[in-house]
Amino acid sequence: RAGDLGEKAKREVARFAFKHPFAQSMVSLIRAMVPYQDGDVAEQKNKYQDPVENSKAIKSLSYFLGAEITGICEIPEYAWFSHYMDGEELVPYHRYAVVMLIDQGYETMEGASGDDFISGAQSMRAYMRGAQIAGIMGEMLRSFGLSSRSQTNADSDVLHTPVTLLAGLGELSRIGEVILNPFIGPRLKTVVLTTDMPLEVDKAVDFGLQKFCSSCLKCARECPCDSISWGKKIMFNGYEMWKPD
């Protein structure tokens, strides 16, 4: 996935500034959970074929485990990565995505400047929780004979942004490549569980954010590094959006 960006990107992709040993400690645990994102599927024939009941059950489980908001969508082909890191072609293998938002915490987000250590730590805490939640859910479904895989920040075969939009969990905002949810704003991290279990899908949401972001401009005004656009949307890779710099 990094190969198309050249040799430097391939070298540097593994180096990331976590700002504090606290954040790095959580990263180690996140990476340790990667082998448990997938596994053998039980041979028993699964009996869970009702999409409506399955969706209610899987969402209830996600909330019990700690997800803030959960949505479901079918995975379009363009939401899958085309290749694995080693260059091998990736063939899409599941139909549905269960997309979960993890709240990074209002008080923590409100107290962070972006230059302090907590900005990285709150991200890693949310990613760690997400990996645990989706990992448990995937393991349970596989034990029922249902093929499933958790897609985390440490190892994901799907792009999270398109499935988050399709699952009705928010809209793109002026901030750029960041999804804003109507209840928790942009203070979220995502984790995805892909599966072939029959599910009832949700619809994409429109809560008026495009019109609001066209006139508000507060995020652009307050951005300390002036990376948020003051202008109108542009076309980027075939998509209309506000492009951060």
Predicted regions and their residues:
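Iron-sulfur (Fe-S) cluster-binding modules
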Residues: 1-69
